Amino acid sequence: MIVKVRVIPNAPENEVVSRIGSVLRVKVTAGEVNEEANNALRGYLAEFFEVAPRAVNIIRGAKGREKTVEITGQPEESLRRVMESIP
């Protein structure tokens, strides 16, 4: 499943803030230095969607806050249900 993500770094905790259509707004505790935010995002999304960290790949936007992320490791239907549960 392909997901658009807007990352908010330096947050007090990792959390999915909201979903607007297929775009997730995600806060991560890591800063923007040396891939820290990308690694934190991968780890958090893996936990959130219940997949292995290697199943979360940033395919576009690795150096910006707007990212396109591919999530594999679960059936598309299961991942879509998780997405739809986000307010």
Where are the predicted features?
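C-terminal structural segments of small proteins and small subunits
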Residues: 53-87
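A generic structural signal for short, solvent-exposed coil/turn residues
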Residues: 8, 18, 50, 61-63
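Residue-level signal for inorganic ion chemistry
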Residues: 5, 45, 56
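Compact, glycine-rich, soluble single-domain proteins
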Residues: 15, 19-49
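Solvent-exposed beta-strand sheet faces enriched in polar/charged residues
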Residues: 6-8, 27, 59, 72
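A generic structural signal for short beta-strands and their flanking turns/coil linkers
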Residues: 1-3, 20-24, 52-54, 65-67
